[in-house]
């Protein structure tokens, strides 16, 4: 008889590797090439050892090639790949999606995601989607979908294109995707949801440092939320992971990490006991979240915390 293990929070955890961490210029000295490659191999091995099975990638820079040279063997990972902009033409989008797999050293990918919802809403949206469907039919990608935010109307796009996966920014500070019913609508359509920007660009971790200019007016609200977490003796990383991982409609929670140390911190927080908190009381007001815009829908890195 095969023993079935209990579900673990790590089952939902996915990683996106930050190859060039965005930090203060004087706070970080870039590693030499050989050390950088070894650090990446160590990060991926740490992810594999922790039970992470999904890696989210992006086509810009040299990140795909670096990953392709650093996978552990045998590799336990599936990958999601993003398209380049449709401004380059649908032929270029298709060719680059194929090239991404070559650079990653993989015969196929788990999911191919349209980078911007605007690409689907435009005049060539249907032609673009047809190319993705053709790549899926040829077995190069198991699933196809798109990335969007709440302002893009992701449920409406999902009804039109019937994706397998939608990637959305969801975090403790900005809970609009949940409370506007988008998650429920996508679940009813049978669409898998991948959550990104789960750490809201590290805003909950900033203490004693200036906030980004666009968030300076929300300092009091952020301070109030941090104070409530401190009074409950809950680490901000633990709280935001628990919130997103606790959403039943979310099948993957993508954390952007720049090192094995950051990943270990994420894994420890994900495995911590789920706190009993009033999640809705820990969000920014919806109008505030909407005004904050990209600050809450950034890359979800934890550089400010690690």
For the regions a protein language model found, what residue spans apply to each?
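Beta/alpha (TIM)-barrel catalytic core signal, keyed to glycine-rich beta->alpha loops juxtaposed to Asp/Glu
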Residues: 9, 36, 117-296, 300-306
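Active-site mouth loops of central-metabolism enzymes
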Residues: 19-38, 82-91, 116, 121, ...
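N-terminal binding-site loop/beta-alpha segment at the start of enzyme catalytic domains
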Residues: 1-77
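Acidic (Asp/Glu)-rich catalytic clusters
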Residues: 5-9, 67-78, 98-107, 157-161, ...
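Short, acidic/polar
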Residues: 31-47, 89-105, 148-157, 237-240
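Alpha-helix-loop-beta-strand connector modules within alpha/beta enzyme cores
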Residues: 64-82, 130-139
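Acidic-and-aromatic substrate-binding clefts and catalytic sites of carbohydrate-active enzymes
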Residues: 54-66, 86-91, 119-123, 172-178
């Amino acid at each position: 008889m095969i023993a079935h293990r209990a579900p673990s929070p790590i089952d939902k955890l996915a990683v996106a590797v930050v190859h060039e961490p965005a930090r203060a210029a004087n706070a970080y000295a870039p590693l030499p090439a050989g050390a950088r490659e070894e650090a990446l191999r160590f990060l991926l091995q740490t992810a594999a050892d922790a039970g992470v099975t999904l890696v989210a990638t992006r086509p810009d820079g040299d990140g795909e090639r670096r990953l392709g040279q650093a996978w552990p063997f045998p590799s336990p990972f599936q990958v999601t790949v993003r398209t380049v902009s449709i401004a380059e033409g649908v032929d270029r989008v298709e060719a680059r999606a194929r090239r991404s797999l070559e650079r990653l050293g993989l015969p196929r990918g788990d999911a191919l995601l349209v980078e911007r919802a605007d690409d689907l809403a435009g005049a060539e949206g249907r032609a673009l989607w047809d190319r993705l469907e053709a790549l899926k039919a040829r077995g190069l990608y198991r699933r196809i979908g798109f990335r969007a935010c709440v302002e893009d109307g992701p449920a409406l796009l999902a009804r039109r294109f019937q994706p397998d996966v939608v990637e959305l920014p969801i975090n403790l500070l900005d809970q609009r995707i949940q409370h506007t019913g988008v998650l429920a609508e996508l679940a009813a359509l049978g669409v898998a949801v991948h959550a990104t920007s789960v750490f809201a660009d590290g805003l909950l971790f900033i203490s004693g440092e200036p906030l980004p200019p666009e968030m300076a007016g929300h300092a009091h609200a952020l301070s109030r939320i941090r104070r409530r977490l401190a009074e409950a003796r809950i680490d901000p990383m633990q709280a935001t992971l628990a919130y997103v991982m606790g959403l039943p409609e979310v099948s993957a929670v993508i954390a952007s990490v720049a090192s094995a140390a950051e990943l270990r911190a994420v894994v420890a927080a994900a495995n911590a006991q789920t706190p009993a908190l009033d999640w809705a009381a820990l969000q920014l007001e919806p109008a505030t979240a909407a005004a904050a815009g990209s600050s809450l829908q950034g890359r979800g890195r934890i550089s400010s915390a690690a």
